[in-house]
Amino acid sequence: MKILRLFVLLAPALVAPGVALAHGGSYSGPGTSAPGGAQVPPGTADPPASATRWETWWAANKEAFLRLNEQMREDVDPTSQAGGGAKPKPDKSAAELRRLRDEATRSALVPVFVEALSDESFEVRTAAAIALGKAGGTDGAKALREMSFKDKHKDVRDAAVLALGLLGRETDIPFLDARLRDDKDNPRHRAFAAFALGLIGGEDAAAALLAFAEGSPDKPSTFEREPAALVASTFVAMGLTGDARVLPTLRQALINPRFDDNIRAFVVLSLGRVKDRASLAEFGSLLAVERPTTKDVGLRRSAAIALGKMATAADAATVDVLCAAARNDPDENVRQFAAVSLGGIADATIKKRLEAMLGESPTAGRPFLALALAIAHDSDAAPAIRAALAKETDESTKSSYCIALGLLGDKEAAPLIEKQVEDRGRIWLQGYAALALGLLHHVESCDMLNARLMSDNDPRLRGNLAVALGLMHDPRSKNWLVATLKRADATVYERGGAAMGLGVLRLNEAVPEIVDVYRDKKEHEMVRAFAVVSLGLIADPSPVPKLSRFAIDNNYTLAIDPLNEVLTIL
């Protein structure tokens, strides 16, 4: 999608990190870097990084932990989903009032999105289709179906199909099933139909995907002869449905010699997403450091991720396999994914094992172990991470410690984290430190963060500063973003970034200003489209953006063109 491709090139000059790849591309196996750069959901700014850096994992998975939609809509002291301590109970009357305001805003925006579907700019139409899907605007379902095959631009057609999945209506399953089966259409469009079915989920969507893969008595399957990217996309979609009926087909695919290891690696991820405990032993064998049943790193990386979704702390053999992989696997990504999986299933014993690994690990391995301890809610590890931050010199590693301490809710770390902002090192360390202060709800830092927001000239840092202030419900972030949006001398990139920032902060009260920008036909096409994207973020009621399901717990070292494209959509 052109606007999203532009966003990649211009990301250093924009507030939010939404990113994209060009259309096209080929099916490829695992590599040493995330394909095409950062392919992540929107939220806070992250640097482009190799697939072995913690920033790449965080960019793909952060929505699950930040839960910005939930955090920004709280009228009380917010805490991160992964943060330590009990979350204060919101006042019921205030929460109900907020719910009503959100519903009213959403209802008012749906007609705006429907109107934007007919905009002369295909960028705006593309953004409007996705925004309509996020908002659950069923009034636009008919228009989306028509756009999916009539719009003159392929980006809009693809977005319309995916938007039908975001709407989540079972009544659209037959239409999407027909689009998936249309072998005259291009494979990416058909893959988007599969993804849409996965997003709708449930028995009927799973049945459509299974019928496509397995055939029927009157129409034998040609699935194995379909393009590899479409086959892999179908298996990804099966995992998204969450329906146990897909398990036999996925298990069979794992042993089907017609499917290569790259396809099978996606199958492993889907079995993990559906929590197929029957595959625990097999995946443990894939991951075993000594005498694994495969040498394919893509399969082993996927197994490390999947075991974290399928296992519990009581599965002693699986825990031992994950611990061995986190310590000693020759592949860096396997070690990292295994550590994160241990954090997700940790009990007191696993926490102690992770603490020991953190103490013994070389510097390169510590970011993921610190994050694993944060995911495990291991407050006992906070002093060790604090001490590591105090003496660390590598700014990337320091950044990971800041995020880990923020997720742990370790308020004792606030002065040390604040120092990372005040020392004015690289912008990424400052940005992550600011975000950590927001996660801690350290309101004592608000004046300092606001002063930096006003004085700094790097939009990437300003984006993280604005989100940090937003997490603490400080109104100055909104005021700065609105002022930037209205500034006549602001660049296209600054105005587009400000529009996106208002969406990231889910500011209902900024909707009139953002709508005005979209409707201003004299405004730059890029800014107008970002305004619609921003409105879509505000209208989305999901605690975690629906499209982030493709990125969370994904093996981002694998690449297929349709999935790469979905991962770029804002």
PLM segments and residue spans:
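Eukaryotic tandem repeat interaction scaffolds
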Residues: R426-W428, Y432, A436-G438, A451-G503
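Bacterial N-terminal signal peptides
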Residues: F7-A16
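Extended repeat-based scaffolds of very large eukaryotic assembly and lipid-transport proteins
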Residues: A20-T138, K142-K150, K154-D158, L167-F192, ...
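Membrane-topology and secretion signals of cell-surface/extracellular proteins
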Residues: P187-R190, A228-A229, P362-T363, D394-E395, ...
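Ankyrin-repeat and related helical/solenoid repeat scaffolds used for protein-protein interactions
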Residues: L485-K486, V492-I552
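Positively charged n-region of N-terminal signal peptides that target proteins for export
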Residues: M1-R5
